[in-house]
């Protein structure tokens, strides 16, 4: 049950994290998101290709079929691993240094009259992603150069 919740949270986190090059130097999310998006597009093709290739070149070999099916299953699980990691990451509380940075961005957004949700607990990475997405839309490019 929790596995599917983490996958859903991971998909939401994937969509809400801004893919800015400056953030890629600080957080691993950019690399994980790009790898997950790549895996979502191409791993189903690889899974079908593995089984088709086996059927064309080794029809009567049962062990080759088992290896091809196993390869297909592994290929299909790779995007799920990325989504699971993103889901776990989204609920992880921010480190103290990142929390300070989070509150600084919130203050800048308040200066441009952007409404922010009220946090009753320590901010997590999903909150950071939401704030960064708003900053991407509302703040100028100079903000990203200051990072």
Curated annotation (Swiss-Prot):
Subcellular location per the Swiss-Prot or TrEMBL entry: Cell inner membrane
Nucleotidyltransferase as UniProt keyword: no
Membrane-crossing segments per the record: 32-52, 65-85
GO CC annotations on file: plasma membrane
Bilayer topology: Multi-pass membrane protein
Keywords attached to this entry: Cell inner membrane, Cell membrane, Membrane, Transmembrane, Transmembrane helix
Annotated Pfam families: DUF412
Domain of life according to the entry: Bacteria
Family: Belongs to the UPF0208 family.
Name of this chain's protein: UPF0208 membrane protein PM0703
Organism annotation: Pasteurella multocida (strain Pm70)
